[in-house]
């Protein structure tokens, strides 16, 4: 026979001692969005602006050597020049308000946790913005007056419909090699292999793990860089690989940085790229990541503002490549 109803039970209220009134013990653990540090900021060409919101780059056309025999007049040749501007006109920001009255009754400093979340969100937005500009640069034409010195971006397209994972992986690797060859034909061979970067979405990365030669140690040097068991693809056609979830995998109609960062449905299928960090993009920055905590006495609260002001533009579209993978979003990796 149970004698539960006869017990005197601390922290249990009610006539039948069946209402749990235990106090909570806060362990100092706060679960929030996973931490993230920008992967592209250390690689990008970032220029801080002072006293202006416009950065200017000069562009020169190409030159051509000529031959001369004795007695012939030397020909003069004009070098065409142009300029390219990038304007910073948009501020990315986050604002949070904390009522004094609520702060008096809380057991941890939420402002610190929120500030960390803000910094991580801005890092994600920066990396996404970089990739958006790379995939857009791949579809850009060369400057009209400078076509002898500049080339268009390199945009290739693949239809993965009906393919197996191995077939898709093989086609992606071959198409990536075509982009590499194009860059080498543009006298970018040294730069491609020394600083070139191939970012790709996790879905594309998973497909490449199914590639026979890419994962076969017989096709790699001692101390293999690609390893199926460790789910590692470090090099593709001689170029460093970066697996990143920052690709826009669906259309973006209202990007906070403005319409130049909106992504169409077609552009969202460009989930593998190749670019040269020192040449492809330039970032004009008016204000690096900053946080300000200030007191709003009228509203009896603290306000936390976190912000960053910059713009990213395609400096040299002819050093940007992307592969548009039709059907990548619905591709069955197990097929």
From Swiss-Prot:
GO cellular component: viral capsid
Compartments where located: Virion
UniProt superkingdom: Viruses
Keywords for the protein's UniProt record, in alphabetical order: Capsid protein, Late protein, Virion
Function of the molecule: Assembles to form a prolate capsid about 56 nm in length and 41 nm in width.
Official protein name in the record: Major capsid protein
Organism: Pseudomonas phage phiKMV
């Amino acid at each position: 026979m149970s004698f539960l109803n006869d017990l005197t039970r601390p922290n249990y209220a009610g006539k039948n001692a069946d209402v749990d009134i235990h106090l909570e013990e806060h362990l100092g653990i706060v679960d929030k969005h996973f931490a993230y540090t920008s992967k592209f900021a250390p690689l990008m060409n970032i220029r801080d602006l002072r006293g202006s919101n416009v950065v200017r780059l000069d562009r020169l056309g190409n030159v051509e050597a000529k031959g001369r025999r004795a007695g012939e007049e030397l020909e003069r040749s004009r070098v065409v020049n142009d300029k390219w501007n990038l304007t910073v006109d948009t501020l990315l920001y986050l604002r949070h308000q904390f009522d004094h009255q609520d702060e008096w009754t809380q057991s941890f400093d939420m402002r610190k946790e929120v500030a960390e979340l803000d910094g991580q969100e801005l890092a994600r937005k920066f990396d996404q913005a970089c990739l958006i500009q790379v995939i857009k640069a791949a579809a850009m034409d060369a400057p009209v007056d400078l076509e002898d010195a500049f080339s268009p971006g390199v945009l290739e397209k693949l239809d993965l419909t009906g393919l197996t994972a191995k077939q898709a992986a093989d086609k992606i690797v071959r198409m990536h090699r075509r982009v590499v060859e194009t860059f080498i034909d543009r006298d970018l061979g040294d730069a491609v292999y020394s600083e070139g970067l191939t970012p790709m979405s996790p879905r594309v990365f998973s497909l490449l793990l199914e590639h026979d030669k890419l994962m076969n140690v017989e096709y790699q040097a001692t101390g293999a860089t690609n390893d199926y068991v460790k789910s590692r693809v470090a090099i593709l056609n001689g170029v460093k690989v970066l697996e990143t979830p920052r690709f826009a995998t669906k259309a973006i109609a209202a990007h906070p940085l403005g319409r130049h960062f909106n992504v169409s449905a077609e552009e969202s299928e460009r989930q593998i790229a190749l670019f040269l960090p020192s040449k492809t993009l330039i970032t004009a920055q008016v204000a690096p990541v900053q946080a300000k905590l200030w007191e709003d006495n009228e509203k009896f609260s603290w306000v936390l503002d976190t912000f960053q002001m910059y713009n990213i533009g395609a400096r040299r579209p002819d050093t940007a490549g992307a592969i548009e993978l039709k059907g990548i979003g619905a591709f069955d990796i197990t097929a």
